[in-house]
Amino acid sequence: MSNQVYCRRPVRNLTLTGCFAAVLGGLILFLCLVCVSVTVTLNFRPLYYLDMKLLHISDSSGYSNDVIRKNFDVLIRYNNIWHTGILNFPDFPMSESGRIHFEEVKKVFSVFEYGALILIPLSAVEIMAAKKKRFGSLFAAAGIISVGIPASLGLLIAANWEWVFITFHKIVFQNDYWLFDPYTDPVITILPDEFFMHCAALIMLLVLAGSLAFFAAWKKLAKKKVK
């Protein structure tokens, strides 16, 4: 009986305003979690280094591991918000359409990186206020959102990754520059689709891990509120 009270009482006592505040605050925490997860995944180079072995990228591309790693590192540094120069691969030529696409990709990543810088302090204030007021429903909403959306995307990816990949590019990029020609933009040969799928999986795992933290905070505050 006591477990039911712990779980339900904070939600049952919510007013309409409280529900709105919980959902809005939960969305902010979720967006912060997504921005941080994307930024971490972008800079987590060991994932790519592992895929170099698992996906046999050297064999499929025809380039040595040293060349692949060097050019990949250049690409990651370019996508960092602190990098202000143009993209120049040490060993790969690049077409004008390829250059434009990478500029667009950098803008997309910048949204998440700047989003993380803005939302981290905002979320910290929100979390401290929720703990002070014992507003556990905020964490409940954040946890539910952080589970529901990644789970839905995960099902889509598991069902048809190629469709998800293509649809994402069509929505985000208003051109077909993302369709690389390996002869004019050989960098695409070291960036297999499977690597991006693994990146998506890591992002979702990080978000789901964050959702567990939200649920743990909700349960802890729910117990304190009952006492």
Explain the meaning of each model-derived region.
Residues 80-118, 194-203:
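Individual transmembrane alpha-helix segments
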Residues 2-48:
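Hydrophobic secretory-pathway targeting helix
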Residues 177-227:
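Terminal transmembrane helical module of multi-pass membrane proteins
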Residues 159-182:
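Juxtamembrane non-transmembrane "cap" segments at the membrane-aqueous interface
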Residues 28-31, 110-124, 202-211:
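Hydrophobic alpha-helical transmembrane segments
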Residues 61-82:
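Short, non-transmembrane cytosolic segments of multipass membrane proteins
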Residues 42-60:
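Alpha-helical transmembrane signal-anchor/signal-peptide segments
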Residues 12-23, 120-165, 213-227:
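Juxtamembrane interface at the cytosolic side of transmembrane helices
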